[in-house]
Structure formats: C-alpha cells, structure tokens
C-alpha cells in the first residue's frame, strides 16, 4: 500500500508542478483556445492533457519500479505496459487534434488584417515576437486593430475530422489485444446467464469499446472542469472497485489517472487558467477503458458511464453537431445554442445556471452514480 501511495503522490506532484510551465509553453507555441463562456473571452493554453499524461506515466512507472525491487508486490507488468501503450497512443491522437490548424482560415485571417507579409524563415536565434504565430496573435489581440474583433472568432484550429479520429483510435486497442486483456465471456447478473463472446471480443468488442469510451468522454465537456471532474469521479470509483475485488493492476491504472486529474483540476476548475483539449478527454477515456478491461469490470464500468451514454444519444439526435458549451448572459448564466436539448449541459442551462453551477451539478450526479454502483455491485449483486 505504501508503494501505491508513493506512486500516486508522484503522479500528483508531476502534474501539479508541470502545469504552470505548460501554460506558458503552450501559449508561446500557439496552442491555445478561446474560453467562449467568459465575458472577455480570454485565450487560454489548450491541450493541458499533456501534463496529466506526464503525471499518469510517472505514477505507473514509479509503481512498476518500486514493485520490481526484491521483496516488492507481485504485479503483472505486461498488463500495465499494455495499458500505458494504449493511453499514450490515444493521447497523441488527442494532441494532433488539438494542434491541427485550418491553414486556409489562417491565410484568410492574415489577408483581412493587413498587407504586410509574415516572414516564415526562422533563424537559430529568433525572438518570440517574430514567430509567425505570435505575429498573428499580436495582430488578433489588438496590436493591429484592423480586421474583425478577435473575440468573435471561435478558433483557427478546427481539429481533425471525425473519420480520421475514429481510424486513428483503433490501433490503440492493439496493445490490450496483444496481451489478452479482458474476459471473453460475460455473466449477466440476477438471471445468471453467461455469454461467450469468443474471438469476437478481442477483434470487435474491445476496439469498438475503446473507440466509444474515448469519444463519449470527449463529448461530455464544454465547461471549466467538467471533463476532468467527471473523469476523476469515474476513475476513483473504478480504482476502489478494482481494489476491493483484488484487481490491483486495474486499481493502479484508475488511481494513477485520479491522482493526475486531482492536480490538474486545481488549474482547470472554474475559472480555468488552462483548457484540457482532446488530449485530456481521449487520455481519460483510454485509461478508464483500460482499467475496465484489465480488471474485468465492464458491467460496473457501463453503470458508472450512464451520463456519458445519455450524452451519446443526445448528441446522436443532433447528428453530433451540437455544442455543449453555451452563450454567456448578462446575469452570468448560460444559454444554449440550440432550441432542443442535445447535451446534458443544456438541461442545466434551461434552469438558468452559471458555468460553475453546471459543472458542479454534473460532477455531483456522476459521484452519486459511482457511489450507487459501488454499493450495488459490491454489496447487493
């Protein structure tokens, strides 16, 4: 237990100490996004999931190192390394999505703000103000007042298309398939009926499950601290359930994510100083799914994922085109972009809630579902 605690503290500290530096680095690198639900629409560093990834990796690798010492606990290092591989692959896909720039939009924006051309030739010693993206940022932020209000643009970064993202996610399942993670059969509670999936499980169900979980975590976002907070609740519950059932590897994966997320929430909760980006939501989805599969906790995982499943069907109604974030009103509440409810956030927007209240409400609901699931699956079933 001391080994596990030491690894979790390491993951927390790595994320907590690296995030302030990441904020400056990401902004200087042009990896930022507009916080649309604030009055002044500030530009904040995005892709904060990278610091969570570093904390997650540090936690698990420290745990593996400490358990490898003679006299340490016996764990399946192969399973942990496979889970790490899957999480890293998906996190990189999220990072690619975060940094993908619409070059046509950039050129259009450039042409609309002046006739001066930007020199893209870089030298060994270059002042940050001379970098192309920084010149563009300076122009958009008011140093050159021509053109449209910079706060009216949503972002020049439009991300990868849905099809490429889906295809890129699938290879992340290969490490888990290679080590035979998960169970090829499932017993339904109450009726005690067992379904034997056979080869369908590793070749079909496992990749599709990873694809679904990573994407639905990405769907239920839009307010400061929402994606990180809900993932924190889910991963903590998974860790507890895995530990109680003797699935130590699953608990290590889940709690390592929890430790890193707890540190990140200090910076991402309302009002955020850094945004998570797809690198975080994809990372959380992959880590949570890996914990489910490694610990054979799919039934419990489906239960605590109830809000995400509801979000999926709500977004399906809109053809996956609806926005979860809202429009800031004069009184500080948020109003939906849509007349119908296409997201769980829209339910609370209709109740005239602020961004902070929406985030806290959804995290509270997820925590209650997790507690109910722990009682249901450990005591009753």
Positions of predicted regions on the chain:
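Glycine-rich, charge-dense phosphate/pyrophosphate-binding loop(s)
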Residues: 361
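Membrane-proximal soluble regions of multi-pass membrane proteins
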Residues: 307-358
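"…together with the soluble PPM/PP2C metallo-phosphatase catalytic core" -> "…together
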Residues: 1-315, 319, 366-369, 373-381
